[in-house]
């Protein structure tokens, strides 16, 4: 029954197949079955057309072939008929000739034998010419073979003068051939095939094997040295050097080893000695070029060259057993990685110096945005460190062959050096640069004190955030853990913060010293005052203005609000010399070495301390009249009122101002102080425009 329903069988029943489909299939199933059958019929029709087309082409081809064969057979039949007629004619001629020459058969045989002898003699006499021709065509093997055969055959006739002359000429060509083979062996430009041919022929003719091997090794050594000389003289960079060595020196080395092993298998030690000497020379040249790199930007080129060199040396170890330069290559990889770390470290310091020089120029050009300058210094450091780490990551890339060495041979020490020798040392170099600016040696001695401030703020920001980020980034990128003996993060942060403290103190002290010197120069006494003071001296007012400007800069840089500049003095002014003497006994002790915090008030306080200390010491060096003391009192009152609003602790200003006034009172024989009510009036008055000589008389 199944064959009746199979469309591929001869007894297929259409009606039974349709009935079966109507019974088993739904309407959708019938539609789908119809589509499948239509598709199958179309495919079958297409296949039939394709088969017919292909068979038709084959039929045409076969027809052409049969026609061509038929034509060839027709031509062959004609040629065979012609050949048959020619053979019949030849057969007839041979029969006739046999009858004519039959009587002289013995004479003909004797004549043939004589001809052979004459022909042999002709070959003997032509031997030197033939050997010379083969020599000129560089068929040295044929020259040697023919001479040996001739020498053996003619040795019994060597007493014959003619034969002796032939042998002498042939021997001369033979010796020339032997010498030419030796020259070919000695020539460094000879290829491997020529060298092999020369060695084989020389050994075949019995040349001393040790002599031939020695000449071969000498020639090989010279060839390798020529390659080394060419490499040393002609290379653009380390990658070019390695590529050229891979194309010339190393293939030549491998070919020499292969040729020698084939010819002198039992004398390999001499070969290895020569090859090691030349490989040491190559390694020294490559190492010199690798370690002479001076630009950290070429790190990618260095890594590519190092990887290619490593792969070539690894291959040589298997191709030439006994020539293992892999340990030296691994040492070179470690040395080059350290060299690249040192280059990156040098570049970081150079970029930092350039960034600081740009900050100095910006401040000379009256740049006001100190915060942007501080951020610039920090960003220069962060960017350069991240760039250096990215370059060093090339040494551990997945496509770098030597990155897959055992960790204790390369990666472990390299990762440690990336953290300690690069990153930690970069922070050390940054700190050393801060020490240079703090010590003020050389040209740095005359820089704007604000450079120290900007530098200090950059270091402070670095220690608060970026330092931790960079250290963690390095440990993550190079798979390091604290158990690897790494420098603790807190140590690095502490070092940076210490330098920031030194720099900000340097800024405060230099700024205070500069302001104090300006104040003293403006207040230098030329003539004792002849009358009671009428206003605060201009130099004192300028000091307050400079202090307010400094306060504004610090506020913009460090944030926070400035104290109101018009705050009033909350303590009772000194009215008599006795009060001043009594207050001086209870003056607050001023500590000039307190830690400076990175805020406006703390820094301003240190500046004010330095200025007032200079002011006090200058007063102690003078002798005052009654009016001079009054002028000092007015100036002190003004300083107390204006500076107390800026510092973090008003007691500091009050105490130091009291010391200044007390010192002036001690330097006067008959001191009289201005009444407190008049002090306020004098401080409120604007500076008077007086002639310079009169203004000078207000000094003390």
Swiss-Prot record:
UniProt entry tagged with the keyword Lipid metabolism: no
Subcellular location: Golgi apparatus, trans-Golgi network
Lineage: superkingdom: Eukaryota
InterPro entries given in the database record: Vps51
Tissues with expression: Ubiquitously expressed, with particularly strong expression in neuronal cells.
Keyword terms: Coiled coil, Golgi apparatus
GO biological process: endocytic recycling; Golgi organization; Golgi vesicle transport; lysosomal transport; negative regulation of dense core granule transport; positive regulation of dense core granule transport; positive regulation of locomotion involved in locomotory behavior; retrograde transport, endosome to Golgi
Keyword Oxidoreductase: no
GO cellular component: cytosol; EARP complex; GARP complex; membrane
Protein name: Vacuolar protein sorting-associated protein 51 homolog
């Amino acid at each position: 029954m199944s064959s009746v329903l199979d469309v591929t069988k001869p007894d297929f029943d259409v009606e039974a197949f349709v009935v079966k489909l109507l019974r088993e299939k739904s309407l959708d199933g019938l539609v789908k079955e119809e589509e499948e059958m239509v598709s199958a019929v179309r495919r079958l029709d297409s296949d039939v057309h394709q088969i017919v087309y292909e068979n038709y082409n084959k039929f045409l081809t076969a027809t052409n072939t049969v026609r061509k064969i038929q034509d060839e057979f027709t031509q062959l039949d004609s040629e065979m008929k012609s050949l048959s007629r020619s053979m019949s004619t030849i057969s007839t001629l041979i029969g006739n000739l046999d009858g004519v020459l039959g009587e002289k058969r013995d004479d003909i045989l004797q004549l043939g034998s004589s001809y052979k002898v004459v022909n042999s003699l002709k070959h003997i006499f032509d031997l030197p010419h033939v050997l010379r021709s083969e020599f000129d065509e560089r068929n040295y093997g044929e020259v040697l073979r023919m001479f040996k055969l001739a020498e053996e055959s003619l040795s019994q006739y060597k007493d014959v003068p003619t034969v002796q002359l032939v042998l002498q000429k042939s021997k001369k060509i033979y010796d020339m051939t032997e010498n030419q083979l030796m020259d070919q062996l000695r020539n460094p430009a000879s290829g491997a095939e020529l060298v092999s041919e020369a060695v084989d022929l020389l050994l075949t003719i019995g040349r001393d094997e040790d002599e031939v091997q020695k000449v071969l090794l000498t020639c090989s050594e010279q060839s390798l040295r020529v390659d080394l000389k060419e490499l040393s003289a002609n290379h653009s960079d380390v990658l070019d050097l390695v590529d050229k060595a891979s194309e010339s020196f190393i293939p030549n080395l491998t070919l020499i080893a292969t040729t020698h092993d084939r010819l002198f298998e039992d004398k390999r030690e001499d070969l290895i000695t020569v090859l090691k000497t030349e490989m040491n020379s190559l390694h020294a040249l490559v190492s010199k070029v690798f370690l002479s790199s001076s630009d950290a930007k070429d790190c990618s080129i260095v890594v590519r060259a190092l990887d290619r060199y490593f792969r070539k040396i690894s291959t040589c170890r298997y191709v030439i057993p006994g020539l293992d330069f892999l340990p030296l290559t691994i040492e070179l990889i470690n040395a080059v990685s350290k060299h690249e770390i040192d280059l990156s470290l040098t570049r970081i310091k150079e970029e930092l110096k350039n960034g600081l020089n740009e900050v100095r120029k910006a401040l000379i050009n009256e740049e006001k945005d100190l915060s942007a300058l501080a951020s610039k210094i920090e960003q220069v450091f962060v960017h350069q460190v991240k760039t250096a780490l990215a370059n060093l990551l090339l040494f551990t890339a997945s496509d770098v062959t030597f990155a897959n060495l055992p960790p204790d041979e390369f990666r472990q020490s390299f990762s440690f050096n990336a953290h300690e020798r690069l990153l930690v040392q970069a922070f050390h170099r940054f700190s050393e640069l801060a020490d240079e600016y703090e010590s003020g040696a050389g040209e740095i001695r005359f820089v704007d004190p604000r450079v120290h401030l900007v530098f200090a703020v950059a270091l402070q920001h670095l220690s608060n955030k970026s330092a931790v980020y960079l250290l963690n980034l390095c440990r993550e990128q190079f798979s390091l853990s604290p158990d690897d003996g790494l420098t603790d993060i807190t140590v690095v942060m502490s070092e940076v913060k210490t330098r920031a403290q030194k720099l900000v103190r340097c800024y405060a002290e230099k700024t205070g010293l500069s302001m104090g010197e300006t104040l003293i120069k403006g207040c230098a006494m030329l003539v004792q005052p002849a009358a009671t003071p009428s206003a605060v001296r201009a130099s004192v007012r300028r000091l307050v203005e400079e202090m307010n400007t400094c306060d504004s800069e610090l506020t913009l840089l460090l944030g926070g609000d400035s104290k109101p500049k018009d705050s009033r003095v909350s303590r009772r002014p000194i009215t008599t010399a006795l009060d001043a003497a009594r207050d001086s006994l209870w003056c607050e002790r001023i500590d000039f070495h307190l830690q400076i915090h990175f805020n406006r008030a703390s820094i301003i306080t240190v500046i004010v301390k330095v200025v007032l200390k200079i002011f006090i010491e200058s007063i102690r060096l003078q002798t005052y009249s009654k009016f001079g003391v009054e002028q000092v009192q007015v100036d002190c009152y003004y300083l107390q009122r204006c500076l107390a609003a800026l510092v973090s602790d008003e007691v500091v200003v009050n105490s130091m101002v009291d010391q200044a006034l007390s010192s002036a009172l001690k330097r006067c024989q008959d001191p009289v102080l201005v009444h407190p009510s008049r002090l306020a009036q004098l401080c409120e008055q604007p500076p008077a425009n007086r002639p310079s000589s009169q203004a000078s008389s207000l000094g003390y």
